[in-house]
Amino acid sequence: MAARLCCQLDPARDVLCLRPVGAESRGRPFPGPLGALPPASPPVVPTDHGAHLSLRGLPVCAFSSAGPCALRFTSARRMETTVNAHGNLPKVLHKRTLGLSAMSTTDLEAYFKDCVFNEWEELGEEVRLKVFVLGGCRHKLVCSPAPCNFFTSA
């Protein structure tokens, strides 16, 4: 059974918030700019983090009742193709952190919904699917290959 996450845009903070469908929480944004190094200590995750569930490549914090601590995901598989009509997604997101016009928040929200969640649900865990977490998360890649640097992996 694939995990279902809700992707919601918070325009006030200009971040995408992910949370398990049906959860009461709106999720926790990871403070700091995109691509920042992870904090020195791991984020606190409640004991009901859903480790007993089939994660299928999702970070263990995705099932936390407080919401996942990592909010921004993309798929290396999509970045290897020409499906992304906006060009190189890491460059686009990096430009947004600098305050430059690149991709609208609506386009970003649609990109994450269409490219990431559909792959998790339809394809599940596979060798070519690597999950990148922008901003860092100590719980990322629990079922995936060795982590890569997002901004140098495209």
Swiss-Prot record:
An annotated GO BP: symbiont-mediated activation of host NF-kappaB cascade
Main location: host cell
Positions of region (Mitochondrial targeting sequence): 68-117
Domain of life: Viruses
Keywords, alphabetical: Activation of host NF-kappa-B by virus, Activator, Apoptosis, Host cytoplasm, Host G2/M cell cycle arrest by virus, Host mitochondrion, Host nucleus, Host-virus interaction, Modulation of host cell cycle by virus, Transcription, Transcription regulation
Record flagged with keyword Zinc-finger: no
Post-translational modifications reported in the UniProt record: A fraction may be phosphorylated in insect cells and HepG2 cells, a human hepatoblastoma cell line. Phosphorylated in vitro by host protein kinase C or mitogen-activated protein kinase. N-acetylated in insect cells.
GO cellular component, one term: host cell mitochondrion
Localization per Swiss-Prot or TrEMBL: Host cytoplasm; Host nucleus; Host mitochondrion
Entry similarity comment: Belongs to the orthohepadnavirus protein X family.
Annotated HAMAP family: HBV_X
Subunit structure: May form homodimer. May interact with host CEBPA, CFLAR, CREB1, DDB1, E4F1, HBXIP, HSPD1/HSP60, NFKBIA, POLR2E and SMAD4. Interacts with host SMC5-SMC6 complex and induces its degradation. Interacts with host TRPC4AP; leading to prevent ubiquitination of TRPC4AP. Interacts with host PLSCR1; this interaction promotes ubiquitination and degradation of HBx and impairs HBx-mediated cell proliferation.
Function: Multifunctional protein that plays a role in silencing host antiviral defenses and promoting viral transcription. Does not seem to be essential for HBV infection. May be directly involved in development of cirrhosis and liver cancer (hepatocellular carcinoma). Most of cytosolic activities involve modulation of cytosolic calcium. The effect on apoptosis is controversial depending on the cell types in which the studies have been conducted. May induce apoptosis by localizing in mitochondria and causing loss of mitochondrial membrane potential.
Name of the protein in question: Protein X
Organism (species): Hepatitis B virus genotype B/C subtype adw (isolate Okinawa/pODW282/1998) (HBV-B)
